[in-house]
Amino acid sequence: MAKHWDHKNTKLSADPKSMTLAKSLISASTGPHGYAVVLGLGDGSLTKALLLQSRYHVIAIDDDAARVRKLRSELQGAGLYGTRCSVLQKSPVDCSLPPYLATLITTETPDRIKGAWKEIAQALRPYGGIAAPGTMAGKPAGFERSVLNGLPLIRRVGALPGSAQYEGNYARCE
């Protein structure tokens, strides 16, 4: 007879301020699914709030081993680590995100990464990917800038430069 592991998941929680911010960011984005990236961890509350209020696959990046270990442990206890969330120990400034990956990019520690937003913004997906950097000087070219609840927000609007409007098979079946 096979024995089954009786594992009870712990309940994940986030502070009210992070829950409110996550809800606002999700509303401002193109939808509650896709990839969200959190660059720089404080207590991990914003990462947890994004997981609780959306269907995002969340990638959290921080260079502090203790913060990474703590958040991984909480997410593993909740049954979310590896299925909906990854926590990477790496510098959030030098993480080299792939282009067009994220629906949403944000941070729990805006002062630690304020100089890198021009490069980080390249990881936003076309047609509405947003970044909430917390603080930002200037505006990366090709992005729309706005304010969300007092925080600067940048959005990649429309198609990528040089891309074509697809008019393939059955696009014009008059």
What are these regions (language model features)?
Residues D64:
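Conserved SAM/SAH-binding beta-strand->alpha-helix loop
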Residues M1-H33, V38-L39, L51, H57-A60, ...:
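Noncatalytic, solvent-exposed loop/strand surfaces
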Residues R69-L97:
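S-adenosyl-L-methionine
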Residues S29-T30, S54, G79, Q122-P126:
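A generic alpha-to-beta junction signature in SAM-dependent methyltransferases
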Residues G40-K48:
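Glycine-rich SAM-binding Motif I of class I
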Residues G129-A137:
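ADP-ribose/adenylate-binding Rossmann-like module
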Residues T30, P98-P99:
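A short, aliphatic-rich alpha-helical micro-motif
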Residues K114-G129:
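A short glycine-rich, Lys/Arg-flanked "PGG" loop and its adjoining helix->strand segment in the class I
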